[in-house]
């Protein structure tokens, strides 16, 4: 072989015929680390701190199974925060139910909870490509334009679904952590109905949308659909506002971002994510009406996505049941209507809690 140079490859690579061949290029490089999370994270950390150690900023992306991120190399992630790293961690195949067939070891239901323990890690659970683009653009501006010492953790899925074009004016909400995706109304010949707020994140947002259509078609219940791009960012903002209000009692109270966005909302709330209930429960204080949280507590299972979401009780039918339950508690519908829905969806009321299985 000839020697390599800083300019580019100047030698013939023996693995050139492979898909993931080794390549050096001024425009960037891909390191295929294999099953070596500690080594890969160390490489990312070296690049993420190069702005300081070498006075040359790099923009590293480390893509990995989300279960094998913070859970496996948590101390290195903490060191990344301590070292003021800048870069992107991409938790692929994220969520408890999106990675069907790989069971307990691979299915992640808590990486966002772990990410939130690192003060300068900003974490997002994106559903659509336009959300991902907005988040990455914001990260590039903050880390490399304004030179702020954050790093980003973004979860992505391996599930195929349609990605719509970006709606007008949603960028601020995506970055802050929540925005309205749609409002589901009834046909004109139907009377004024009950309204609810359905909030979803990541791949489970599609189950939320499907549930909203069932509620409209079968129960004459309208809904506002919200994408929760970052529960953690919303909670941090809320806690910052709480602190300010506590320390400034003589001044007018401020409102958290999510409180301002939901101030004029109508009806109770259901939050459904592909993560443990504790993730969504963080928002309870800032929700202006009754709230029911669905999540994927328990160990993973090997099965289809449809079966997994039913098992963990986060599919469209459990979202409908949770909605009807909260409406029954508010005396807006009868308990019998809830009971009929449980029978209609063939839900086993004696089903064991997935947490204990």
Predicted regions and their residues:
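Thiamine diphosphate
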Residues: 19, 53-55, 97-106, 116, ...
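Conserved phosphate/anionic-ligand binding catalytic regions in large, soluble enzymes, centered on
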Residues: 33-51, 319
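Single conserved hydrophobic/aromatic residue that forms the stacking wall/gate
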Residues: 1-7, 11
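A glycine-rich helix N-cap at a beta->alpha junction
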Residues: 79-95
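Active-site nucleophile and cofactor-binding loops and adjacent substrate-binding regions
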Residues: 22-41, 62-70, 91-94, 100, ...
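Hydrophobic, small-residue-rich alpha-helical packing segments that form membrane-like cores
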Residues: 111-118, 128
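Active-site-adjacent bridging/hinge elements
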Residues: 9-25, 293-295
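A short, small-residue-rich loop immediately preceding and capping a beta-strand
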Residues: 54-67, 88-91, 198-200
């Amino acid at each position: 072989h000839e020697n390599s140079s800083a300019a580019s490859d100047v030698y013939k690579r023996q693995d050139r015929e492979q898909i993931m061949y080794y390549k050096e290029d001024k425009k960037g490089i891909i390191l295929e680390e294999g099953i070596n999370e500690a080594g890969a994270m160390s490489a990312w950390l070296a690049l993420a701190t190069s702005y300081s150690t070498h006075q040359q900023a790099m923009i590293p992306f480390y893509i990995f199974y989300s279960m094998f991120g913070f859970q496996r190399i948590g101390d290195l992630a903490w060191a990344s925060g301590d070292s003021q790293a800048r870069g992107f961690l991409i938790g692929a195949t994220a969520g408890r139910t999106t990675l069907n067939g790989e069971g307990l070891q691979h299915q992640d239901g808590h990486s966002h909870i772990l990410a939130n323990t690192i003060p300068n890690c900003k974490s997002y659970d994106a559903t659509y490509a336009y959300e991902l683009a907005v988040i990455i653009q914001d990260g590039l501006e903050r880390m490399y334009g304004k030179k702020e010492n954050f790093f980003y953790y973004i979860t992505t899925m391996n599930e195929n679904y349609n990605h719509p074009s970006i709606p007008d004016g949603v960028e601020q909400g995506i970055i802050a952590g929540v925005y309205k995706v749609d409002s589901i109304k009834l046909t004109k010949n139907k009377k004024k109905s009950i309204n609810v707020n359905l909030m979803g994140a990541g791949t489970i947002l599609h189950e939320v949308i499907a549930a909203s259509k069932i509620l409209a078609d079968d129960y004459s219940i309208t809904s506002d659909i919200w994408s929760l791009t970052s529960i953690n960012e919303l909670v941090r903002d809320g806690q910052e506002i709480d602190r300010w209000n506590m320390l400034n009692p003589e001044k007018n109270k401020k409102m958290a971002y999510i409180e301002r966005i939901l101030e004029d909302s109508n009806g109770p709330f259901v939050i459904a994510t592909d993560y443990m209930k504790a993730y969504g429960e963080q928002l309870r204080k800032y929700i202006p009406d009754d709230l029911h949280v669905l999540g994927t507590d328990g160990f993973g299972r090997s099965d289809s996505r449809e079966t997994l979401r039913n098992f963990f009780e986060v599919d469209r039918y459990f979202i409908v049941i949770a909605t009807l339950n909260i409406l029954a508690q508010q005396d807006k519908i009868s308990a019998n209507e809830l009971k009929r829905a449980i029978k209609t969806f063939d839900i086993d009321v004696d089903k064991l809690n997935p947490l204990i299985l």
